[in-house]
Amino acid sequence: MAKEKYERTKPHVNIGTIGHVDHGKTTLTAAISKVLHEEFPDVNPEYDFNQIDSAPEEAARGITINIAHIEYQTEKRHYAHVDCPGHADFVKNMITGAAQMDGAILVVAATDGPMAQTREHVLLARQVGVPKILVALNKCDMVDDEELIELVEEEVRDLLDENGFDRDCPVIHTSAYGALHDDAPDHEKWVQSVKDLMDAVDDYIPTPVHDLDKPFLMPIEDVFTISGRGTVVTGRVERGQLAVNTPVEIVGIRPTQQTTVTSIETFHKTMDACEAGDNTGLLLRGLGRDDVERGQVVAKPGSVTPHTKFEGEVYVLTKDEGGRHSPFFSNYRPQFYFRTTDVTGVIELPEGVEMVQPGDHATFTVELIQPIAMEEGLTFAVREGGHTVGSGRVTKILA
């Protein structure tokens, strides 16, 4: 049976849920899809809550590890929704997930208020350039004291303000559990709160202006083999557009390879073309599963080149922001997280700079052990032992 065609009728927006583990991100994601399925059944499939927590060991631990993508529509827009992991060891995925957001719903339990990971996620959202955050104050059904809810709300607004987000953003009081379960007390009230949340998302998160006129580039997040058809790479198109049967290059990590895209899919529907902002799978002609890997990019031939040496401007996180406790010196070898992968690099501080302290804004040279598809202005995170210790941008390519 031929797959359905993807219809591009409404503006497309990428959003996601971020926040502390156990504050109800995945439950809220399920509640949103259920409420929208009931309101607009023609355009919204029914998702199973257990589908979102996609790996079996997560279900056992009750935590979301892989980033789960679902799609849904409001009256105004088509959304792709990533349910981001809440656990500190999965911050790396958070970076790949959050980088794909045009806006985020910060989920905070009214019973707890902002916790360590709430702060870390807001900080990461700022680092990776999420433009807008609004708040779902969850578990309001478990707090009788309205004043307590208002105190938590004030605390969340302060946290957003401290990290450069709008403190006057919409804050919706909700209960994801109450909206998800038909027999929950005040079910209708909580269903309405989820509708209010999505109205706020429609109005508050701006429709992104995607870079359609720039040369095509898609960072590879995952690689699959489809038997009898070939190798598929998936990711979110960063810029430009691409039609079926167009030649492309695979750039970074290894020597640059030429291939042709023979099929394009999104959410299991085939497309004639994809464009900036689409979550897409590309079928590559003549390449095997082991010829491509996460961290490479698919790009218009000649538009981007691989480099190993650059000068960067970096903000080094303080201890309180989850960064290092001590300074670093020349020859420090952390990982540099570009788009979808970590590459080890050696730092060389400029002459006259002996060390860089947590909290510093620094400029230094980096030499990577593998080439990355790189341009001036490209952002990266500096990571060490699984923790983000800095964020920066490439100011000058040296080699």
UniProtKB/Swiss-Prot annotation:
Annotated region G4: where? 138-141
Chain residue ranges for the region called G3:
83-86
Major localization listed first in the record, in broad terms: cytoplasm
| Origin: domain of life | Bacteria
Kindly give the InterPro entries that the UniProt entry links to this protein.
EF-Tu_GTP-bd, EF-Tu_GTPase, EFTu-like_2, EFTU_2, G_TR_CS, P-loop_NTPase, Small_GTP-bd, T_Tr_GTP-bd_dom
Q: Which catalysed reactions does the entry list for this protein? A: GTP + H2O = GDP + phosphate + H(+)
Map out region (G1) in residue numbers: 19-26
What does it do? GTP hydrolase that promotes the GTP-dependent binding of aminoacyl-tRNA to the A-site of ribosomes during protein biosynthesis.
What name is this protein filed under? Elongation factor Tu
**What is the organism field in this record?**
Bifidobacterium longum (strain NCC 2705)
